[in-house]
Amino acid sequence: AKVQNKIPYFNSELVIKTGASFIFDTHVYVSALSNKIITGMSFFDYINILNRNGELLKRYQFGETPLPQLDDKGTISKYIVYTHLSYSSPNYCYFLRYGTDMNRPDFDDTGMTLIKLDWNGNFVDSYSIEHFLYGFCVDEQNGVLYGVITNRETGTVSIREYKGL
């Protein structure tokens, strides 16, 4: 992951004008103990650590193209979702990242990456998750992630246990 403290330019006017403002969808968590705000953006390849005044302290970027690619009509050429789901505890923030085009017919046959940060914004670890998860939570005491998966053939939904966190 690349760490940045600078926000690159993005054409927000085009986004507002074309109705593509959904690309600013963000998962936001705050810690009263560390006075930090941690955000994971759905359509930008960023996880941001800010202070309570909104000042950017640190930014993680995991890929080469952090900004959504929009044409002049505000249409996204590739519907790439970065932070798909997230979860926080008193100790850590977890961001389940996808980073692949959601328009692919097999999008839910691919795995995901779980990023674990402490409340000071330090990278703790990352984990490969072999399935596409539709929801999750973490049992930190037992080191287990519980994830919601689907089975296309049977049309069923189940909870899968991932140990070793």
Model-identified regions with their sequence ranges:
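Eukaryotic scaffold repeat domains enriched in small/polar residues
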Residues: 1-165
